[in-house]
């Protein structure tokens, strides 16, 4: 549902101008989508590469602040280089968690996480001696977070101001550089979007009105990120995880007693334990997915948070005297503040979300992974490889593998799987194609044929009032009206949809094709009545009828063409395509 909505918004960011949205990300992602030929697969790859590279860079900056040798250092030993590369790879893998919950394209969540990673990397540079550009990167990161999720940007700005002010590490010069970075990023965004500051504010205000009418944020605590916790996945993983972890602890203790143990044996046993953890994760996700609860597996990342907090607390307790820990920081206590900020960033990411706090924080668990690998790597380097942090680190990496498996094996709707099921077919969508199961592909081909026979193009208005996903509208083509998708999930679905449609010109509403689900009691077809009562049976002709299987039910749906008389009824006679 969300991915097709965000793809329609990315493909047609200008279509939402009359009404507005609560984020600006589509204006920035749209040029990228155009550059890759409107191909969804290449857009996904671009988002994956951008996030993975940024996460790796942020991890390297954090490790440098902790005192681990820089990758560019000429005197870096092979073991140290391997440790740094491994840590960066862990961070890159963990960043992929943002593509869970059914969205694989770089949507608003991915853009917000990208901004937070820039904030963390810039903060590490600022707190490190002999490094420049940190405040500028922080400012750019805060603005990029705002483009993706404005509430998260406010949250991270407050966290930074409070933490740095408490440490007295915030100078006027640094604040000025940060504001300058944010201002430059804002100007670039507005130029790309072709919006004035007043237009941007009007756009965001309209989006806030839509969300308020829809009622998808039911309370202030939910807006602040303190929503319900879903831990069923953690309970499912509990026993297998403890068995794997217990095996590692026993092995780690024996290794500490015998440092001369063959490193090949150590590596092999570590690999076996991680693979066991990964296998447990895959099996658990599939087991949960069979009953439609695949997303519950994300709660396993709570373990990552607990270990990250334990690692940061250890630094707070033992200080920075151990082996020169934090010696590159401007002040030793700055490192502790940095680790605390990293532990809090997943919550900042969750602020403003309308899903479970567990799921939201899990998508930003990369910051917990960075805490673990940075602290462990420096601790092990400082005391000759015999570190009490190693157990926490490997456990954290194992948890990352468990959680990252959700990205590729997630069965959030209880049916989809990797690889695609037998009989799957490719259906043309925008500039590329999407592989769908046979039944859905048949509908997709029928919609493409209908679009061709009706001579529809990217300027043809299309409204989906099914109250379900926007996938069929995405396959059909055309441009959305009012909003890229009219949600039917919440109680305010009809008022919100009516407000969106009331902001578009009458000729567009009079000539728009409609996708309707008469068997769905939560459809939003009453919202079509703007200025006059519209009856989908009397004012539209049926172009195509089909049955869609969603949410374990069969739904009757239809593609409708407006009759010429609808324009006169709505008050714009003569309106034609």
List where the protein language model places each region.
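Specific aromatic-rich, kink-prone transmembrane helix
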Residues: 98, 111-129, 134-142
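Short acidic/glycine- and proline-prone juxtamembrane loop motifs at membrane-interface regions
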Residues: 102-112
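Transmembrane-helix motifs of polytopic, lipid-linked glycan transferases
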Residues: 45-81
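Short periplasmic/luminal acceptor-recognition loop of GT-C membrane glycosyltransferases, typified by
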Residues: 404-491, 511-523, 549-552
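Membrane-interface alpha helices of multi-pass inner-membrane proteins
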Residues: 133-150, 156-161, 182-189, 342-351
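Aromatic/acidic, Gly/Pro-rich catalytic loop(s) in extracytoplasmic/lumenal soluble domains
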Residues: 511-577
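Extracytoplasmic catalytic/substrate-binding loops of multi-pass membrane glycan-assembly enzymes
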Residues: 1-8, 16-32, 38-41
